Amino acid sequence: MAARLCCQLDPARDVLCLRPVGAESRGRPFPGPLGALPPASPPVVPTDHGAHLSLRGLPVCAFSSAGPCALRFTSARRMETTVNAHGNLPKVLHKRTLGLSAMSTTDLEAYFKDCVFNEWEELGEEVRLKVFVLGGCRHKLVCSPAPCNFFTSA
């Protein structure tokens, strides 16, 4: 059974918030700019983090009742193709952190919904699917290959 996450845009903070469908929480944004190094200590995750569930490549914090601590995901598989009509997604997101016009928040929200969640649900865990977490998360890649640097992996 694939995990279902809700992707919601918070325009006030200009971040995408992910949370398990049906959860009461709106999720926790990871403070700091995109691509920042992870904090020195791991984020606190409640004991009901859903480790007993089939994660299928999702970070263990995705099932936390407080919401996942990592909010921004993309798929290396999509970045290897020409499906992304906006060009190189890491460059686009990096430009947004600098305050430059690149991709609208609506386009970003649609990109994450269409490219990431559909792959998790339809394809599940596979060798070519690597999950990148922008901003860092100590719980990322629990079922995936060795982590890569997002901004140098495209």
UniProtKB/Swiss-Prot annotation:
Its main location: host cell. This is Protein X. It comes from Hepatitis B virus genotype B/C subtype adw (isolate Okinawa/pODW282/1998). It is found in: Host cytoplasm; Host nucleus; Host mitochondrion. GO terms for biological process: DNA-templated transcription; symbiont-mediated activation of host NF-kappaB cascade; symbiont-mediated arrest of host cell cycle during G2/M transition; viral genome replication. InterPro entries: Transactivation_prot_X (IPR000236). Keywords: Activation of host NF-kappa-B by virus, Activator, Apoptosis, Host cytoplasm, Host G2/M cell cycle arrest by virus, Host mitochondrion, Host nucleus, Host-virus interaction, Modulation of host cell cycle by virus, Transcription, Transcription regulation. Multifunctional protein that plays a role in silencing host antiviral defenses and promoting viral transcription. Does not seem to be essential for HBV infection. May be directly involved in development of cirrhosis and liver cancer (hepatocellular carcinoma). Most of cytosolic activities involve modulation of cytosolic calcium. The effect on apoptosis is controversial depending on the cell types in which the studies have been conducted. May induce apoptosis by localizing in mitochondria and causing loss of mitochondrial membrane potential. Belongs to the orthohepadnavirus protein X family. A fraction may be phosphorylated in insect cells and HepG2 cells, a human hepatoblastoma cell line. Phosphorylated in vitro by host protein kinase C or mitogen-activated protein kinase. N-acetylated in insect cells.
